[in-house]
From Swiss-Prot:
This is Betaine aldehyde dehydrogenase. Keywords: Metal-binding, NAD, NADP, Oxidation, Oxidoreductase, Potassium. It comes from Burkholderia ambifaria (strain MC40-6). The record marks 247 as: Seems to be a necessary countercharge to the potassium cations. K(+) 2 binds at residues 245, 456, 459. One of its GO terms (molecular function) is metal ion binding.
Length: 489
């Protein structure tokens, strides 16, 4: 018997049964308890969802921007009213501490919808005079039906981030959440319907990567917004281009550097480093896992980090006092433990953690201790590859030029941070770092107003911020001739 029962698809403003006859299970990573059986979408189901979205999009786009804005604002109110209920589901599905999901996941998702609801009426074209009796004007028109493919680490937040600009601009979206954490996207669909979003404008199809491929290759999808790993992102981009030259937005992986200079407030730097590595049990794409510390302060900094790691409260995610929960799945646990073994084998010095936690109630969950490695080298696997778990690598450096070159020596470019009391050096360093999201003397906040996305193989395009709205529209140029037409022939 599962906690939440059978989960169906959400198409055309309500729940429908999948035609595949297949289901998959989702489990509580803290206890191993079966949370739900989820119906897997078939190709026919994806076609049905896209057809429903096309129909709903025409009605949605025909509304005024002010009407769409009001409906989205109602959805925001409903999200906030149901914050505690949604946070409880998210905690069971992801293993995140309840204090985290209550304060972050739904709150930040609602903030982004509210932000774009406010911008819906600000979508404008241009008027360009050519001569006395002729001018050009432009219209920003919706793309049509977009596909959203979510990651497992921030299920409802990612669904909000992807739907908000799409819907504000007059598009519809067919969304596929990760099969690892599939529950809260369905609740968002319920909320949009209750708020007044027309049937079909937001549909949810469940399943593994094969369902994502069906969406990415569908001829009636105009744009794909994907969050996930680099290798999968490359496949998405290839299929999107080969099928119908779809537009793409992709937020992919990272191996982000955090640079601590010799003049840094070391207590502040240690607080930042611990947050940048262990928030959400290290399952955050922007994690600052390569911690470069000036050699003169490395020992003092490391001592402060280890003191803070000892204060991390690992426990049941449903306990209010817990601030560090399990990894999302057994597969992710195995992956992280493999990286830890690699760090030990390659000569990194294990300073904290490094083991699976199995005592008591930990034994039934996917828990790994917060892990810190010292004496790391740039060529180590734990330094070069994305782990997506609670593993910090500390490296030392001597000069500014050296650390910038080493920080940039990666095919990732998602995030970077600098801790220093010298603001001139802070800005100078940040401007030379090849990363799309940067922080000075802080880490991790991504407000609705801030465009987020990566350089290099960490992504294409941006989410959030004003400019993202433009990428959910296409420009139509119109010339108007008021005077006499001068024929060529």
């Amino acid at each position: 018997m599962s906690v939440y029962g059978l989960q169906r698809l959400y198409i055309g403003g309500g729940y429908v049964d999948a035609t595949s006859g297949k289901t998959f299970d989702t489990f509580d990573p803290a206890t191993g308890e079966l949370l739900a059986q989820v119906q897997q979408a078939s190709a026919a189901d994806v076609d049905r969802a896209v057809a429903s979205a096309r129909e709903g999009q025409r009605e949605w786009a025909a509304m005024t921007a002010m009407q769409r804005s009001r409906i989205l604002r109602r959805a925001v109110d409903l999200l906030r009213e149901r914050n505690d209920e949604l946070a409880a589901i998210e905690t069971r599905d992801t293993g995140k501490p309840i204090g985290e999901t209550l304060a972050v996941d739904i709150v930040t998702g609602a903030d982004v919808i509210e932000y774009y609801a406010g911008l819906a009426t600000a979508i404008e074209g241009l008027q360009v005079p050519l001569r006395a009796e002729s001018f050009v004007y432009t219209r920003r028109e919706p793309l049509g039906v977009c596909a959203g493919i979510g990651a497992w680490n921030y299920p409802i937040q990612i669904a909000c981030w992807k739907t908000a600009p799409a819907l504000a601009a007059g598009n519809a979206m067919v969304f596929k959440p990760s099969e690892v954490t599939p529950l809260t996207a369905l609740k968002l669909a319920e909320i949009y319907t209750e708020a007044g979003v027309p049937a079909g404008v937001f549909n949810v199809v469940q399943g593994d990567g094969s369902v994502g491929a069906l969406l990415t290759g569908h001829p009636d999808i105009a744009k794909v917004s994907f969050t996930g790993g680099v290798e999968t992102g490359k496949k998405v981009m290839s299929l999107a281009g080969a099928s119908s030259l779809k537009e793409v937005t992709m937020e992919l992986g990272g191996k982000s550097p955090l640079i601590v200079f010799e003049d840094a407030d070391l207590d502040r730097a240690a607080d930042i480093a611990v947050t940048a590595n262990f928030f959400s049990s290290g399952q955050v794409c922007t994690n600052g896992t390569r911690v470069f510390v000036h050699r003169s302060v490395k020992d003092a900094f490391t001592q402060r980090v280890l003191e803070r790691v000892k204060r991390i409260r690992v426990g049941k995610p449903t306990d209010a006092d817990t601030n560090f929960g399990p990894l999302v799945s057994a597969a992710q646990l195995d992956k992280v433990l493999g990286f830890i073994d690699s760090g030990k084998a390659e000569g990194a010095k294990l300073l904290a953690g490094g083991t699976r936690l199995t005592d008591g109630h930990f034994g039934s969950g996917q828990y790994v201790a917060p892990t810190v490695f010292g004496d790391c080298r740039d060529d180590m696997k734990i330094v070069r590859e994305e782990i997506f778990g609670p593993v910090m690598s500390i490296l030392d450096f001597e000069s500014e030029d050296e650390v910038i070159a080493r920080a940039n020596d990666t095919h990732y470019g998602l995030a970077a941070g600098v801790v220093t009391e010298n603001l001139s050096r802070a800005h100078r360093t940040i401007h030379r770092l090849e990363a799309g999201i940067c922080w000075i003397n802080t880490w991790g906040e991504s407000p609705a107003e801030m465009p987020v996305g990566g350089y290099k193989q960490s992504g294409v395009g941006r989410e959030n911020g004003i400019t993202t709205l433009e990428h959910y529209t296409r420009i139509k140029s119109v010339q108007v001739e008021l005077g006499r037409y001068n024929p060529v022939f």
